[in-house]
């Protein structure tokens, strides 16, 4: 049933297992992705568990459904309570759908039937869940003495009728992580579409922001625009922080008034067919920058982002771009009199710039907004000392880590520099060794700004890069705000 070429299992000379499943006859009709791993096997059974239906605690109301991303990556199925097996030796992909439940069908509508699943998904077999236990038992009886059953987690062991299964719960997860780090054409299209909808929503906010009075209105309009354009789900909780709230990296309360605030940091991205976008724009609550300080910080972050984006290409180490961003930030903050008393390199090595730019420069984007990827087993000796001053591990995601591989064609990464003036961070910095490099009196004048972050999703291409994010920024952003006044 599955299409030829990429949908077949291929075991190469290096024992790479490539599994690509075509999503046919549905709204995507594309490959959802592939799994590549040096499993070193020609037989075995891959077993994946989809997201079950779960109620809220102490409630009869179900939680919103969100498919497990590893399951979706291999199957393309966005239905609850499904299972998937792949018999490597026999090249047999089987989807298990929920058994028919009359009570549920009356209340909620029927679940996916075998016939519907066959028409929608290009798999070899579709069976009801009642067959799952017996099918796995038969596979185990025939093959499990010499072949393993591969699962993602120890908590996802299948039930069988008898006997202990020979399982492996260590190899499949890193194999899928490595595959997900490189996006194919279908995945790039999904991320591009998510960005298209996000750009529409960001633009709509800019057109109307001067008529708004609360952060909640910003969040509401963004959601309304996304849903009305077919993107029901957000890739993450919307961050609409005004004033000092813009200095809170993951501020999601979005419940304060806008009056008297200078800027809004809007970090919001739609999801499209389970694929994320991640977009941040910072804009004034006026037709122009309300203060020279706000303008200067925006232009500094703009420079940080532009200089880093122009250097993205395959073979680049992403952490080197983070170093560059910190160097540009330090130079700019020294010009503004916020950093002082040392050379750029001395200040960078001290870690003082992390008070103002505490997070990583970016991360992978895909089925998760902070997507997974392959990791090097060891970092190059000496790296840790060089990068440690500008790297806060708890606030950094791959590829902004020592274990990250070099950028490769097909990776999608964010570039999201920011400069923040957090009361808490500044108060804590007074107690640290690098305090001598910070002019606290000057820095505290910038606290009303909160923070500025600009974030785009960048595809690494064969010849360099492509910016997938089209949300307005810079002068175009200001022009839209101004036109909104007159409309």
Curated annotation (Swiss-Prot):
Gene Ontology BP annotations: proteolysis
Gene3D superfamilies: Creatinase/methionine aminopeptidase superfamily, Creatinase/prolidase N-terminal domain
Example GO molecular function: peptidase activity
Residues that coordinate or bind Mn(2+) 2: 267, 278, 455
PROSITE patterns noted in UniProt: PROLINE_PEPTIDASE
Pfam families in the cross-refs: AMP_N (PF05195), Peptidase_M24 (PF00557)
Free-text comment on the cofactor: Binds 2 manganese ions per subunit.
Signal peptide location: none
InterPro entries: Aminopep_P_N, Creatin/AminoP/Spt16_N, Creatinase/aminopeptidase-like, Pept_M24, Peptidase_M24B_aminopep-P_CS, X-Pro_dipept-like
Catalytic activity: Release of any N-terminal amino acid, including proline, that is linked to proline, even from a dipeptide or tripeptide
EC code: 3.4.11.9
Positions contributing to Mn(2+) 1 binding: 278, 416, 455
Cofactors required: Mn(2+)
Family recorded in the similarity comment: Belongs to the peptidase M24B family.
Protein name per its UniProtKB record: Probable Xaa-Pro aminopeptidase AFUA_1G14920
């Amino acid at each position: 049933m599955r299409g030829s070429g990429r949908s077949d299992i291929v075991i190469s000379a290096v024992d790479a297992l490539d599994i690509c499943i075509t999503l046919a006859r549905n709204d995507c009709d594309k490959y959802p992705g592939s799994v590549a791993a040096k499993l070193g096997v020609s037989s075995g059974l891959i077993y994946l568990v989809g997201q079950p239906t779960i109620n809220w605690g102490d409630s009869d109301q179900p939680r919103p459904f969100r498919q497990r991303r590893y399951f979706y990556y291999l199957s393309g199925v966005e239905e609850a309570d499904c299972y998937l097996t792949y018999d490597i030796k026999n090249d047999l992909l089987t989807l298990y759908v929920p058994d028919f439940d009359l009570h549920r069908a009356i209340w909620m509508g029927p679940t996916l039937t075998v016939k519907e699943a066959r028409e929608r998904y290009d798999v070899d077999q579709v069976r009801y869940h009642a067959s799952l236990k017996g099918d796995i038992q038969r596979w185990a009886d025939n093959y499990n003495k010499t072949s393993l059953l591969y699962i993602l987690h120890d908590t996802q062991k299948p039930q069988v009728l008898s006997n202990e299964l020979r399982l492996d719960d260590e190899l499949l997860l890193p194999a899928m992580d490595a595959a997900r780090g490189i996006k194919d054409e279908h995945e790039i299209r999904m991320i591009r579409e998510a960005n298209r909808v996000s750009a529409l929503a960001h633009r709509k906010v800019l057109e109307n922001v001067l008529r708004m009075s609360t952060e909640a209105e910003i969040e509401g309009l963004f959601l309304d625009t996304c849903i009305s354009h077919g993107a029901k789900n957000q890739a993450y909780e919307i961050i609409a922080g005004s004033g000092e709230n813009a200095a809170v990296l993951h501020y999601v309360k979005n419940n304060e008034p806008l009056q008297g605030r200078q800027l809004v940091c809007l970090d919001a991205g739609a999801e499209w067919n389970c694929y994320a976008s991640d977009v941040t724009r910072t804009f004034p609550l006026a037709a122009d920058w309300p203060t020279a300080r706000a303008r200067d910080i925006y232009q500094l972050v703009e420079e940080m982002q532009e200089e880093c984006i122009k250097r993205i290409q395959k073979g680049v180490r992403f952490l080197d771009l983070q170093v560059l961003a910190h160097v540009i930030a330090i130079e700019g903050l020294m010009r503004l009199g916020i950093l002082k008393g040392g050379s750029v390199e001395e200040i960078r090595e001290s870690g003082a710039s992390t008070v103002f730019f505490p997070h990583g420069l970016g991360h992978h984007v895909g089925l998760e907004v902070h997507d997974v990827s392959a990791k090097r087993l060891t970092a190059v000796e000496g790296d840790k000392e060089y990068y440690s001053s500008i790297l806060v591990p708890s606030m950094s995601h791959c590829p902004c880590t020592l274990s990250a591989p070099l950028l490769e064609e097909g990776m999608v990464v964010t570039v999201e520099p920011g400069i923040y003036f957090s009361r808490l961070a500044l108060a804590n910095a007074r107690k640290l060794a690098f305090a001598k490099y910070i002019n606290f009196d000057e820095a505290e004048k910038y606290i009303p700004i909160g923070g500025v972050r600009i974030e785009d999703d960048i595809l690494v291409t064969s010849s360099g890069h492509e910016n997938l994010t089209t949300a307005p920024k810079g002068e175009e952003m200001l022009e839209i705000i101004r036109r909104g006044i007159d409309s």
